[in-house]
């Protein structure tokens, strides 16, 4: 008993000495020394107890060594974890690791799990760091359940970078969280722009891993194949954060790994094609979408909105009008079984035998979807179970027809919409258009539409005639007003009235009508806005970009380059999309040297202030220069991204480097370089290795 009391006194002295030390480094050293002393003293006590036990116990083989500090510290960790005391558990773990290394796998798993349940970013980061440390120093495979819980907790706490680190660790071992859990992880990651960058890159890595496993006929391939929900979450985020080029790359992965695009996918793909100006790609979906049944019409409002927007961007009023008429038709009320089966839509040229074809199922919606697609409502709205034109879309149509002098075609369109919407008698659309033209003093245009409606057997009401007559009178256009007055008398609108009485009535009607619409945001306001706004990108640019895209998809890069060279000759400024198409085309053929030439053009355009390169294009350039071994260009792009505060996914760049150039110049010293070119390249390679944290 005295011996045990002395041990306790000695232990208290050592701990008190540790607590009284003010220097942190000294405290650590003292604590480590104290723990070793405890181990020695406790072992001596245990030995004495054993000797006594041997003399008094007939079964000495049952001797227990629970008195060691190993067990004491393990017990402290266990107790602290049960009591959810993370500070104490972490301190005890560090003490244990300094003396004995890592604790047992089960205890280590409990610690990681308890840290994962914390909502404090501090402890979540500790958990992530611990996992990486274990993988680096301990030859043990951490159970995927621990990593799954941790990745979800990190994502929920808006820590996408460490969350992706854990996911990538799992992917390296060809293991991923269950798909429904991965949905949630990605859902939380893509709430932020940086999270979307990382999630999209991680999806690319999953697809690469899946393709590699499939080639090797690996059974794990089925477990890591991403589904349409993962694609939808990432693509929707690309739309929200305007990552159009990245979105295009993700879309092309779907047919490569055999993922079917559902109704949500199609809607999101439509928005990405709109952002990229790829009208021809979107038109390929139209025949399939036109055949969907009435219950799905609301869902595809965004599809028609995007396609109509592209028609306007291409200044194709005839196609816009045709699309509008298609929208106003009667939709089939019954679901069609054939639209619930996969259908193939080609990507790029239809004539390419080796071209990609994406599978779509227009009437497939996942019941347990966690995605809520919120498209914009700019041109097409949904009212009373039907798709209808917004005032903005109508203003664009009026502007387009007026610019090309085809008012009669506008009148025909308005009349057709009336007939197709089954509201011929009560529709106010033509009169709204005429009123808007009158407010903008486009009196000739208003009169032309009025005449067209009259000739088609659908004359306007007296109020519309009176408004136009009053406008003529105010503008002192007496010849036109007299002609209109004859029309009014012929139509029986002003019988047995003198001209003076007609003028008085018309002016009075016009005043009353203006007062009624004074506070109403109407078509005229949208027309004024449309006329004052110039197209951000001239229609001809979209035409050129479409041609370049077509040639690149057909692997006709020489024709694509010729088309690109014609742009400055015609004084047309290339856009980011122009360079995206070119770089993507050259990359598909692994023509990395040609990409360096395009990069030179891009730099000249940036220096002149005519171009701002997007983050997704910058990253794509960086990866291609890395694959081609152009490290000077790699560091240039990195410098550009730093200068513009763009997030850089170092994990991905590091992985790409190690895959392609792991031993490049690893042992070569600058003094041993044979040429100046090799010396400079060595310098850039070392700079890159240092930047991504290799060596």
Please report, for each region that a protein language model flagged, where it lies by residue:
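A basic, Ser/Thr-enriched alpha-helical scaffold prevalent
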Residues: 1-695
